Amino acid sequence: VIRPLIVLVLLFTAVIEPARAATDAKALLISIRKRMESSGKYTAELRLKVDIPFMKAPEAKATLAFTPPNSTKITSKGFAMIPKQSTELSALSLLSGEFAAIDMGTENFKGLTLRKIKIIPADESGNIVVATLFVDESAMLTRKVTATAKSGGTVAAELVYDNVKAASYCLPSYMKISMEVPNFEIPRTITGDFNESSQPKKPVDPNGKTKASVEIWYEKYRFGY
């Protein structure tokens, strides 16, 4: 009698634990979303440095304006190459609608043990099909994000939080976006002209992809303006 009871307990545990992990993972992400939503209206000054083969782009400046619940506008008076991934990879953007969360365990990143959570947005009209958030549970901050777009391309972002006030709303002071894009078809929003790089051109990837990165510094946050 005891042995069958033990088997039933083990089976029940095997079923309930993954469900509990998924629930806890989603609850964690919802907590982060609520912190970001509590920021209210804000602006920030941006510095952008773009590294794309075959193109030489000067460091640019822009202004970011956020209006609840999830409207982000980036403008620049001069030259600006602003990848749309800079807003798509925001935790608030990824978590703004309904989503499924899958607990993928933990992963070490720059000396930190991060909770790895895969999310699948319920809204199929968005550009992001699936994303993985690497969460620092002790600080309740997303340190890294990887995402797959409808085009099949993979994008990754690393985030730093040096501004204490901004970090309290899970907003970064620095973000580095790395991606692969089709050769000669760099996705961008441009104001002004750009110059072809004077550096020797790198060999074209046989898979038809070009590696690119964008560094963004977020400065002079203004909340509740």
Language model segments and positions:
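Sec-dependent N-terminal signal peptides
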Residues: P4-T13
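Sec/Tat signal peptide C-region and signal peptidase I cleavage site
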Residues: I16-A21
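Flexible, processing/modification-adjacent segments and terminal tails
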Residues: A22-K41, E45-D51, M55-P58, A65-L141, ...
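Gly/Pro-enriched, hydrophobic low-complexity segments
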Residues: T113-Y225
